[in-house]
């Protein structure tokens, strides 16, 4: 007999987890659409050269790649941004610019597993391609803000930076040739100790005193205006770096004008993003109560990525919700719904002789927009109610043989165990209205 098991970093989702994920996906879809983003899809498998064109040595090591039956080198997508750049280059003549898309799909990375990090996970991306307008950068931050609010997260922080600022600091320090390695090292702040990051930079040829200054800069915190003022001297006269500072100031002004609460969006000079394709604004979002969980929604501007696949310039900006990490965080905080069913009403199967009546009642409740599960067997009442409570139904509707004769029904609130008698006297519409009203009252209490 084969032992049922899953690979390390891969997992099954039980109903409660899958339902919680679907709920967040529905919210993300609604928020993305409210800003005009349209859905697309791309293959899970791409030519390997598509995926490795603008990654990094670290990303390449994490790729699941192989030679297929046609002797082609192929790989599983490690994110949704690179396939989108290929997609845009291939279809831009049809799409037009600027083009706004969202994409929710599974990706694969052969990385070390840890809390909230898996080798197979889902990303929920949205991107705008074909414009360098700072409005697109601003909108990206606003979508992230609105999404986290809609999910019901009350305490979160969006941390922003600009890769041009970091580049300017490095050029002013004479480290332009080592910028890629230094940025990757800075991206590990918060995941590794300050000394470990300094040592790693030293391994890339950065003098220890310069490495400490860079780490000190990355650790700056406080009001955005003060952080930018402290970074400005480090950028010096570097024109591109000053463009980055101006871009962050413009972004913060827009965030304030859009009505985002003060303190929700802060400047964090350590935010670099590990992927090499980012060129401008970058952002990461954190649960304030679980800062060590890592970013739950990240992204930024990538103006050159599509240039790997087309001569047409297609600058882009976007972000991705890491739904699996977010779910892990919500579960740790005890804020994840535990219901194992999408249905709210459990219709008890009390008497097989009334099967037709039960089916008509269930159909009428569903036609009214309610979600209903009818138990398939006429088991003992206590047994059915115990199962209904375990699975997380809101109410159980009990109509027995004698109850059919009297024209009444029992509606049991499975959370409080309170029971309400409904006098419907064979009027199906009256029964539906009564159940609907009770459900609305229960929902409003939650």
Task: Annotate the PLM regions.
Residues 1-18:
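Auxiliary tRNA-acceptor-end handling modules of aminoacyl-tRNA synthetases
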Residues 12, 169-176:
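Phosphate-rich ligand and nucleic-acid binding surfaces
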Residues 17-35, 46-47, 70-71, 80-94, ...:
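Positively charged, Gly/Ser-enriched RNA/tRNA-binding surfaces
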Residues 40, 44-74, 117:
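Polyanion/phosphate-binding surface patch
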Residues 61-70, 175-196, 287-289:
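Acidic, His- and aromatic-enriched active-site or binding-groove loops in soluble protein domains
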Residues 118-124, 160-168:
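Short, conserved phosphate-binding/catalytic loop or strand-edge motifs used
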Residues 155-164, 182-183, 265-270:
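Short, surface-exposed recognition loops or helix-turn segments adjacent to catalytic cores
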